[in-house]
């Protein structure tokens, strides 16, 4: 009997992606984050869809419509907070996924890695425009500050900012277009994720040793499906705990004040997941320089395959590279903390040091550590 799972054009794709996919036998829990990101995306699209049914993208009613969702819509409060905290979970999974790729040398799959970098930019753009929609103080001023960065571009800057705003300030037109972007981008992300997966399945997954694992493969189902379900349950548990016990833990109190163009909040600061980039932006005294550093802090990921000097793919057996990697993680956590602090004496200088260290680690120290290891191993 011919198995429909393996012959039907549509079922065949699903089968080769989630069922009969040959998977390395030794991949660790760090390989769970890909499926968790897929789960996050589906969850965000679904909660977002239900929020969009009750939201009005208009300066006069946006803030009230969010309040209406929380108070009058059945289970609106949980949909709203799942969506807001789901974004934080999305970024936690995203950074873990990228960290895994850096540590185990998964960036050697160049197409997969480059599409991943594009995905990161798209998700960041989506999160930014989404944060503007509730039209609170932080939404409004966040939009003003970040879109204003375009004005740092020489000659065309000012025109470009007014073009993005659709006027001479962040106003009705800006909110409406941001809602349109926020609605369309997740579907673009879904398409890009499929392409990301397509390129990954051309080569097969990497594994913790960084050695080709064609000799030792297992079917994805049931081994990895059950493992992914466990990861998903832990993700849902974390998200629900956060949403039901401390929904405003990661939010900003200033966003419970309706947007007012005449009064600036004490400290404009982005959401938890953008603080490291914000700290890098702030640490450079020049506007254009700051914008370039901000862009480069993410774009640098695309250059990592070119900076790989080691004769080994993974960092699993390379202690000096590990030290540099964990120093980078600590540096990013430091930047995240500083991004949330006011621009005062100790923080300003610490932010500058942490920003310099960030680029130094990636561009100089990590490639150097790999070169030293090669020498020590007489390779």
Swiss-Prot record:
Which GO cellular component does the record give, naming just one?
A: mitochondrial inner membrane
Please name one Pfam family that this protein belongs to: Cytochrome_B
Q: How is the cofactor bound?
A: Binds 2 heme b groups non-covalently.
PROSITE patterns given in the database record:
CYTB_CTER, CYTB_NTER
The residues forming a coiled coil are none
Cellular localisation: Mitochondrion inner membrane
Name the UniProt key words of this record, in alphabetical order: Electron transport, Heme, Iron, Membrane, Metal-binding, Mitochondrion, Mitochondrion inner membrane, Respiratory chain, Transmembrane, Transmembrane helix, Transport, Ubiquinone
Its principal location?
mitochondrion
TM region positions: 33-53, 77-98, 113-133, 178-198, 226-246, 288-308, 320-340, 347-367
**Biological process terms in GO annotation:** mitochondrial electron transport, ubiquinol to cytochrome c
Positions contributing to heme b b566 binding = 97, 196
Q: What does this protein do?
A: Component of the ubiquinol-cytochrome c reductase complex (complex III or cytochrome b-c1 complex) that is part of the mitochondrial respiratory chain. The b-c1 complex mediates electron transfer from ubiquinol to cytochrome c. Contributes to the generation of a proton gradient across the mitochondrial membrane that is then used for ATP synthesis.
Extra information: Heme 1 (or BL or b562) is low-potential and absorbs at about 562 nm, and heme 2 (or BH or b566) is high-potential and absorbs at about 566 nm.
What the record says about family reads:
Belongs to the cytochrome b family.
Give the protein name, as stated in the record: Cytochrome b
């Amino acid at each position: 009997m011919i198995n429909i799972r393996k012959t039907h054009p549509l079922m065949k794709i699903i089968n080769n992606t989630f069922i009969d996919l040959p998977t390395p036998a030794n991949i660790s829990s760090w390989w769970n984050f890909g499926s968790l990101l897929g789960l996050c995306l589906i969850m965000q699209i679904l909660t977002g869809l239900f929020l969009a049914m009750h939201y009005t993208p208009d300066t006069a009613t946006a803030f009230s419509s969010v309040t209406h969702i929380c108070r009058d819509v059945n289970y609106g409060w949980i949909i709203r907070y799942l969506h807001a905290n789901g974004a934080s979970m999305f970024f936690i999974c995203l950074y873990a996924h990228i960290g895994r790729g850096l540590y185990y040398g998964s960036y050697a799959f160049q197409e997969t890695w480059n599409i991943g970098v594009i995905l990161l930019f798209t998700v960041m753009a989506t999160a930014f425009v989404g944060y503007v929609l509730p039209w609170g103080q932080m939404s409004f001023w966040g939009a003003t500050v970040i879109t204003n960065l375009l004005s740092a571009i020489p000659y065309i800057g000012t025109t470009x900012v007014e073009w993005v705003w659709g006027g001479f300030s962040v106003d009705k037109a800006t909110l409406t277009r941001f809602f349109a972007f926020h609605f369309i981008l997740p579907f673009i992300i879904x398409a890009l994720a499929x392409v990301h997966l397509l390129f990954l399945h051309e080569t097969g997954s990497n594994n913790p040793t960084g050695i080709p694992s064609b000799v030792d493969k297992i079917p994805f189902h049931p081994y990895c499906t059950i493992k992914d379900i466990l990861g998903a349950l832990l993700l849902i548990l974390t998200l629900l705990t956060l949403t039901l016990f401390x929904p405003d833990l990661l939010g900003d109190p200033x966003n419970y004040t309706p947007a007012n163009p005449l009064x600036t909040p004490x400290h404009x600061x982005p959401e938890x997941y953008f603080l490291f980039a914000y700290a890098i932006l702030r640490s450079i005294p020049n506007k254009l320089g700051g914008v370039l550093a901000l862009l480069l802090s993410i774009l640098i990921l695309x250059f990592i395959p070119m900076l790989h000097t080691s004769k080994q793919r993974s960092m699993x057996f390379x202690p000096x590279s590990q030290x540099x990697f964990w120093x980078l993680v600590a540096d990013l956590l430091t930047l995240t903390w500083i991004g949330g602090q006011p621009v005062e004496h100790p923080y300003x200088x610490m932010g500058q040091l942490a920003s310099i260290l960030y680029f130094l680690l990636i561009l100089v120290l990590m490639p150097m550590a790999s070169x030293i290891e090669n020498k020590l191993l007489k390779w």
